[in-house]
Amino acid sequence: MRTPIMSCCRLMAVALFLFCSMPLFAQRQDILLNDNWKFRFSHQVQKGSEIRVDLPHTWNTQDALSGKIDYKRGIGNYEKKLFIRPEWQGKRLFLRFEGANSIADVFINRRHIGEHRGGYGAFVFEITGEVNYGKENSILVR
């Protein structure tokens, strides 16, 4: 005899089984990329003009303290090299940003993969088809 309680218990048992087995199917690995970026302004084209920064970073935090009326504006370039392991082939790869003010163009190996507008919202780009596996890849955020 089926009772609503038995049906509910069966449903909960199936849901619990599926919930417990999910990690076997979908394991996600997050790698923090905040350290060791190179920053330069777009107008600084000479080699060696970049500085090493860790994220989060802003280039004009000290401007208000300098006594000048204005503050730096323009386009900044953040660059990083990233080795993509060969065993990651066949897996989906994403770049997730916690925020970038105010327009961010993202490039992988000199190919534009997307643009984000807005200052403080997180955004994600899939880079699976843009990377070279077993090699160092370049990330540029402009």
Language-model features and meaning:
Residues 1-28:
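Bacterial Sec-dependent N-terminal signal peptides
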Residues 40-42, 73-142:
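Accessory beta-strand-rich segments of carbohydrate-active enzymes
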Residues 15-17, 23, 37, 92-95:
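Short non-domain terminal segments
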Residues 5, 13, 62-66, 83, ...:
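Sequence-pattern detector for short linear motifs
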